[in-house]
Amino acid sequence: TLYNFLKSYKAKVETEVIGMAGSIASVLAMAASPGKLSIARNGFVVIHRAWGGAIGNSDDLRAAANMIDKYTDQICDIYAQRTGKSVEEIKGLIANGDYWMTGVEAQAQGFADKVFND
């Protein structure tokens, strides 16, 4: 995945959230090197459970739902590694849908290292 590529990149990876890092963009932002994830004070990070869709018979739909649950587990693990929170804490944040954080809130919860005003 692109996240894995960025995490394994030998040079420092710096991410800067100028507007919003929502959905998979929030996962990519987590690939920043330690101390290198910054967000605008008026920026947002939005996290949620994985989404998907499927067509087919009931077995196909169950398989798709299981895969979406696995994606959610992987995403929550990435957030947990970055923030120092447990996977269960992350799942609690997203249990009721989208979880929005301002730049200041994202930093306070470990989803960003620095807040900037520009």
Locations of regions flagged by a protein language model:
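N-terminal organellar transit peptides
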Residues: 1-26, 30-118
